[in-house]
UniProtKB/Swiss-Prot annotation:
GO MF, one annotated term: ATP binding
InterPro entries: GHMP_kinase_C_dom, GHMP_kinase_C_sf, GHMP_kinase_N_dom, GHMP_knse_ATP-bd_CS, Homoserine_kinase, Ribosomal_Su5_D2-typ_SF, Ribsml_uS5_D2-typ_fold_subgr
Gene designation: thrB
NCBIfam families: thrB
Binding site for ATP: 79-89
Subcellular location: Cytoplasm
SUPFAM superfamilies assigned to the protein according to its UniProt record, in alphabetical order: GHMP Kinase, C-terminal domain, Ribosomal protein S5 domain 2-like
Function: Catalyzes the ATP-dependent phosphorylation of L-homoserine to L-homoserine phosphate.
Pfam families: GHMP_kinases_C, GHMP_kinases_N
Record-listed E.C. numbers: 2.7.1.39
Official protein name in the record: Homoserine kinase
GO biological process per UniProt: threonine biosynthetic process
Family, per entry: Belongs to the GHMP kinase family. Homoserine kinase subfamily.
Amino acid sequence: MRIRVPATTANLGPGFDSCGLALTLYLTLDIGAEADSWYIEHNIGGGIPHDETNVIIETALNLAPNLTPHHLVMTCDIPPARGLGSSSAAVVAGIELANTLAELKLSKEEKVRIAAEIEGHPDNVAPAVLGNWVVGAKLDGEDFYVRHLFPDCALIAFIPKAELLTSESRGVLPDTLPFKEAVQASSIANVMIAAILRNDMALAGEMMERDLWHEKYRSQLVPHLTQIRDVAKSQGAYAACLSGAGPTVLVFAPRNLANTLQTSLQTLEIDADVLLLDVEGSGAEVFR
């Protein structure tokens, strides 16, 4: 059996800790034969555990402690610590692993709830489970979210080789915002969401670049954001914004500009991969 979970981008600018979008990069987990102990082969390196302390296995065992150990093979196209939901993908893969092997028959809603409890909020895990675009909130321990189709557009991901830990990126954020600034930040997010629902990417893109919640603080850790935004906008893109906590920058553009933008971004003197992606519509899947 095979489990496949997509990458996700969170925030989309002003939709801080609320908006998430599934992308066509994947964590793939092949479930092999039963074994005496858990072992997971993977292509990540960097000290990621191979035993039951691995997040995937740990998550599965928290849900189903009596699972029979298996040999697992993980292939992950989602680079860690780049703002593309790698940890959320691992958590969701663990939930799917337990659900499959223990026949838990979890609903998608239950999967989102469990994953959001582990991750703290639903912005990455909800689109990883459900696919497409999700707007969510966690209030008094309860998850509220809406899944909707994202407008058709090209997505160009500028993924630096250097990592940026979420904890470091969150560390530069202020504890509070002045009331008037928070009201303005909220109104910007509201207009962005309304524009997306109306398939108006031009207006949505303008709002994406006017975030007041987090990007101006995180830009000190991601100095290439302004440079990429200038290049993208000069060539007709809708917007460029941080993917999650960064350092990845995601460019939204008309499809006919995708290749030109990719080429232009590849010429920047920053060590990075520049990938053409799409919105992933299905979310986590199990292939039997």
